[in-house]
Amino acid sequence: MDKNNNNLRLILAIALSFLFIALYSYFFQKPNKTTTQTTKQETTNNHTATSPNAPNAQHFSTTQTTPQENLLSTISFEHARIEIDSLGRIKQVYLKDKKYLTPKQKGFLEHVGHLFSSKENAQPPLKELPLLAADKLKPLEVRFLDPTLNNKAFNTPYSASKTTLGPNEQLVLTQDLGTLSIIKTLTFYDDLHYDLKIAFKSPNNLIPSYVITNGYRPVADLDSYTFSGVLLENSDKKIEKIEDKDAKEIKRFSNTLFLSSVDRYFTTLLFTKDPQGFEALIDSEIGTKNPLGFISLKNEANLHGYIGPKDYRSLKAISPMLTDVIEYGLITFFAKGVFVLLDYLYQFVGNWGWAIILLTIIVRIILYPLSYKGMVSMQKLKELAPKMKELQEKYKGEPQKLQAHMMQLYKKHGANPLGGCLPLILQIPVFFAIYRVLYNAVELKSSEWILWIHDLSIMDPYFILPLLMGASMYWHQSVTPNTMTDPMQAKIFKLLPLLFTIFLITFPAGLVLYWTTNNILSVLQQLIINKVLENKKRMHAQNKKEH
């Protein structure tokens, strides 16, 4: 039984190692793929007719590009700039806040090469960060289901009430299509959310069926391997996700409250305050099968939008439901609570690094009762190791008798052979929740901690934290009771600190800080428990001697 327990602990440790390998490969290895970018001419040549009730992303394309290339209006903010083109679309959004202007992180080998090179390693910051791709579907593009009307709309530029404006100012965009006029009224705010009203004028007051899009997802974080695609939520709070390359057919969603296109840090979205929601259509981009979102409309519309960072507090201030745009995978329900706690701690200490350390301390306190039981159990197993070895020798070749006597021994001394594994198992979901939070949180981008850590969202530039993590893990092993009787298992366990150091060396510094702090707290906790158990053992021996 003891051997089985040791095997289980070894399997868990190795499983964790392989999970780290998988994470490393998934998040940090660049896949061998090329992005297919369909030119306007290719789009025209490959055009196929589709049902007018199910508009394809390329269904309304046109080779007339002159109006699309003209800049119509510019909205300027303190930390951003938005451009509107001649088709009444958001042509580009530029962020000017310095936290988004740090240069792209180098790959591991390139970084190491520069680290040991005499050449200047610093890269100049960006002047501004564009969020949208130049050749992709633009937010606020209107498409009509009538092909003739749609073609005319794509060749007729809008007029604007203003060419330059600031936050809280109203912009009226008008497109005259002869018997029909479209009026878009826009008001942009400092937090990058906006109000949108779509109205029509026609002699017969008839409004043709049309769609409007929130646009193709931002492309400011192309090397990220977190969720990228379309995410929407309906009135029942059910969230639907369509990832890049997975849009294989047109999908319809009724009672939709918000429609968003996201990458790791940024989003472009449309939402409504009407509890009945709207009908959303998810189509596929030709060539890539990346999802494209549309809202199907038959009347005039009052909508709201946002385009910018997935900052939790900003989104919550606009509308609490928009915080669901921040996606953490299968453990979102748990990870969101972790982030809320982390954000609260940040508000308290004013530094994300110290907030991570406080979060780690809180997690250790919550898990302390189970950790204590596990450590006590491991200490008891260590003390029973000589007796267990005797039983293994005595009942060699008789596994059933050996197991029965082992269980009697455990019961007599109150030892739990699985007690040391439980804390390790419980830390797995906690670790992955914290991992997703620290990797996805745009709040950590360009966030300093101390000294050499100037950005907690990227790897430690000098690999000091990963080395400290490995050393702390080895230290933890040295103070933890060793219940292994198999020399090979013991050798494998000794290699784990080195293995984890290699896996974590390119992980975000914030995550490595959490793991290092967790190891140090585990060591301190183990030393305290060892001292407590030693005192109890001494007192027990003294009482036994007196009697």
UniProtKB/Swiss-Prot annotation:
Residues 51-62 have a biased composition (Polar residues). One of its GO terms (cellular component) is plasma membrane. Disulfide bonds: none annotated. NCBIfam families: PRK01318.2-1, PRK01318.2-4, yidC_nterm, yidC_oxa1_cterm. The gene is yidC. The chain crosses the membrane at residues 8-28, 325-345, 348-368, 414-434, 449-469, 495-515. This is Membrane protein insertase YidC. It comes from Helicobacter pylori (strain ATCC 700392 / 26695) (Campylobacter pylori). Residues 37-62 are annotated as: Disordered.
